[in-house]
Amino acid sequence: VSSGLRLDEDREYDSEGPLLELDGVSKHFGQESGLLAGLQFDASEFPPFTVEQERVRAVDDVSIEIRPGETLGLVGESGCGKSTLGRTVLRLLEPTEGDIYFKGENLADLDGEALRQTRSDMQMIFQDPQSSLDPRMKVGQIIEEPMRAHDMLDDEGREARAKELLAKVGLDPRHYNRHPHAFSGGQRQRINLARALSVDPDFVVCDEPVSALDVSIQAQVLNTMERLQREFGLTYLFIAHDLSVIRHISDRVAVMYLGHIVELAGKEELFENPQHPYTRALLESIPVPDPRENGSRGVLEGEVPSPVDPPSGCRFRTRCPHLIAPDAYDWTGEKWPRTRAFMRAVKRRTFEPMPAARIEAEFFDGTPPRGEAGSIVAEAIDLVATDGEADGDEADRWEAATDLLLESFAEESVCARERPAYDLESGDGERFAACHLHR
C-alpha cells in the first residue's frame, strides 16, 4: 500500500474471510399502474375488494461472497438486475429481503453515525462520466465533496489530497480549478475514480464504468483501475455487459439472468469451460474478428421474460436450448429436441401457416413422436395447420396450440418444477451453476 494517501492504516476485520457477503438478498419494486390495477373482488370477504400491487422482482435471492482485494465481475444482459444489485449492496436501495454483511457487520443493523462511517468504506463509480459530475462545480470541489460529507481533513488537507489523487489517476493536479466540460469522457471517468478514492474506501462498486467510453480509451481506464486497486488495496464489484471488459479486469465472474445468479466461477474457468447454457450463449454471441470465421455466432433466441412474472424453476428455461425433456413421456433419438423446437416455433410463431404434412416434414423429418407425446404434437399440428380440422379463428388456434404444448411439455420439465442450484467440482476454488443439467 502506498504512503500518504491511506487515511486509516488499521483495518480491524478478518482478512481471511469475505469482505462483503450477501445472504439471500432480494430487491423488489412496486409497479406503478392505473387507478384500478390489481383490484380483486371476493364476495366471501369483507370488504370484498382488495388491491394487490404487482412487484418487479429486480433482484431475487442472491447469495455471494467477495474477498478482500479481488475483483468480482458481474455480467448479464441489460435489465437483468446488475445495477440494482450494486445499489442495494451499498444500501442506496434498501433490500426487500436478505442480509448484507460488510466486514462481518450486518448493514441492516447500522444506522446514524455507524452507517455513515461504513459508507465511507464503500463507494461507487457510475456509468456516465458526464451526468455523474456536477457541471457547476470545479474538479477539486467534486473530489473533495465526499471528504466534506465525512468530515475528513481540513480545507488545506482536502485540497492537497485532491491534487494528489488527480496525479494518481493520471491527470494534471493543475486541473484542480477546471470544470468537467473541459475534459474528455475518459478524463471525466478518471475524475470519478479520484472522487471515489477520496474517502479511502475498501470496497468500490463499479457500475459499467467504461461502457460510455471509446474502445481505445477503455483499456487505459481499466489499467488505471487495476493499478489503483493494487496501490490502495481495493476490492471491486465490477458490473458490465461487455464480456471482454469483464475478462480484462475480473478475478471471478458472476453471471446474472433475470435477477438470479446462474453461474459463478474463476474467470479463466468460466470463459474456457462455461457450465450454464446462458453463460455459453453469452460467450457464443461475442463477435470474432476473423475473416476466416464463416459460421454464424450463437444468438440468444426469444425475449427476456418480465421480472413481474418470471418463469418458475430456472428462469432461463423459456430461452434455453437445452430444456430438459419431461419424464412423463417416452422419448427416443431426436424426438425431444425436435418437439422442443416445434413448441418454441409455435410459441414465437416463427413459421407461416402450412399443411400438416409439411409441418411434420420440416420439424420432425416426417416422423413425429409416438405415444402420448405424439398425440399432443398431432393435436397441436392440427390447430396450426392450414388443412387442420380445429374450429376457431387463426389467432385463437395458435394460442391454443401454444398453451397445449407449453402445459404438456415445458411446464412438466424439471427445469420448470424446481429451482436449480449446484456446487460443482472445480480446480479454481468455488464454482456454482444453477442448471439441472448438473443433477
Regions found by a protein language model. Name each.
Residues V1-P18, Q31-P47, K267-A434, R439:
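Charged, flexible cofactor/metal-binding loops and thiol motifs
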Residues G38-P47, E105-N106, G157-R174, L283-E284:
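Conserved ABC ATPase "signature" region
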Residues V51-Q53, L107-Q123, A149, E269-P274, ...:
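ABC ATPase NBD coupling module
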Residues G98-N106:
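Conserved ABC transporter NBD signature motif
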Residues D200:
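Conserved catalytic motifs of ABC-family nucleotide-binding domains
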Residues P209, L213, I217-G295:
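P-loop NTP-binding/switch modules centered on Walker-like glycine-rich loops
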